[in-house]
């Protein structure tokens, strides 16, 4: 089961045991299994992709999986510089390494219109661990396929193949320069002031975040300004929501803190999604994990209201609106957190939030800040 779970690109393993394992004598412990290694990409495949890139037509290299870490992004950035191609990250990725000194990468947007605009004019799409881009849902009068009709799609590496190795060989074939053209530069913003908004929460984090932090991002609609503020901060790991289910933000932050006890972890959590797995706070308290949970308290399932508009609903009636409201009654995140043993604060101004965030970074966690945002 361990070997299956560790197999690239990461799997889910279910272990079924007979009941008598609980009381019968067992044999000696099983030896630690060897982790499966990614299979190599055929040389011919890499040469074909190199040939495509040498043509100089508008090309996009779409990345996902292990190539979203520092080495893979660096290699992709070198290839982009040599070929003129753009590098874009798949919309959802389990882990991305970003920040100062790392290669700049765009991310495919969730809404269809901006995604279509990003890929407009693309003649060749090269997949490295990624899947062909399609819309997340079916929406009226919107295409499901996000690439232009005449775009040719090429697969350099599947998810279970050695994408890093393939990029290294491709960079050599293209005589790529030693470093990417675009690297994230250090841009530390001033602390925000006044009324607290989701964007200002991210601005405050960008001003104060320590190097090598880990961000578990399930801010949903409140994370729209995240990249604008965070990309120029010191190096950090970004753990994205990986699909359509909600509730992964705090459990992922908990796991990251267990795995990396020497790094500060930030759980950027939408309030509606957080209600699914708030028991993570108890685990954080029990294990004394260094996690700062920041709750975007807009008191609504804002993403679902957006989906209503996308399917053509122009006016939301009182009954439907009440289904998406989190204000009847209002959820008291401070009391919820303290009931689970986590030190908690509520902020509704930037000045309060800045103060609480700075204190939470200085002091080992866990901590929770409920950011009551106005938007």
Language model regions located:
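Short, solvent-exposed amphipathic alpha-helical segments in soluble enzyme
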Residues: 1-4, 30-32, 73-84, 140-145, ...
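Glycine-rich, anion-gripping cofactor-binding loops and their flanking helix/strand elements
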Residues: 65-156, 233-263, 275-279, 310, ...
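Thiamine diphosphate
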Residues: 82, 225-375
């Amino acid at each position: 089961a361990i070997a299956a779970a560790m197999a690239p690109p990461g799997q889910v393993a279910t272990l079924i045991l007979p009941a008598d394992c609980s009381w019968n004598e067992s044999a000696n412990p099983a030896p630690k299994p060897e982790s499966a290694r990614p299979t190599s990409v055929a040389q011919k495949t890499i040469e074909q992709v190199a040939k495509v890139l040498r043509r100089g037509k508008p090309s996009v290299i779409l990345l996902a999986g292990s190539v979203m870490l520092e080495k893979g992004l660096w290699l992709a950035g070198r290839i982009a510089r040599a070929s003129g191609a753009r590098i874009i990250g798949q919309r959802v990725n389990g882990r991305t390494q970003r920040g100062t000194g790392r290669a700049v990468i765009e991310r495919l947007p969730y809404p269809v219109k901006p995604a279509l605009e990003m890929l407009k004019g693309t003649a060749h799409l090269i997949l490295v661990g990624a899947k062909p881009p399609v819309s997340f849902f079916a929406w009226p009068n919107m295409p499901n396929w996000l690439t232009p009709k005449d775009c040719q799609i090429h697969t350099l590496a599947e998810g279970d193949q050695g994408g890093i190795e393939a990029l290294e060989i491709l960079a050599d074939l293209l005589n790529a320069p030693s470093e990417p053209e675009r690297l994230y530069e250090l841009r530390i913003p001033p602390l925000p002031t006044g009324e607290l908004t989701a964007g200002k929460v991210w601005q405050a984090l960008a001003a104060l975040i320590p190097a090598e932090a880990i961000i578990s991002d399930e801010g949903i609609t409140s994370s729209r300004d995240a990249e604008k503020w965070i990309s120029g901060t010191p190096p950090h790991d970004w753990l994205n929501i990986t699909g359509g289910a909600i509730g992964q933000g705090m459990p992922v932050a908990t796991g990251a803190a267990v795995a990396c006890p020497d790094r500060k972890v930030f759980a950027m959590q939408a309030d509606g999604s957080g209600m699914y797995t708030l028991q993570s706070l108890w685990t954080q308290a029990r294990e004394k994990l260094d996690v700062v949970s920041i709750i975007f308290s807009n008191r609504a399932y804002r993403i679902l209201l957006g989906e209503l508009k996308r399917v053509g609903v122009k006016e939301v009636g009182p009954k439907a609106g009440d289904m998406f409201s989190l204000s009847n009654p209002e959820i008291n995140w401070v009391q919820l957190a303290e009931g689970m043993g986590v030190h908690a604060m509520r902020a509704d101004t930037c000045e309060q939030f800045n103060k609480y965030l700075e204190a939470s970074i200085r002091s080992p966690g866990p901590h929770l800040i409920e950011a009551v945002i106005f938007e």
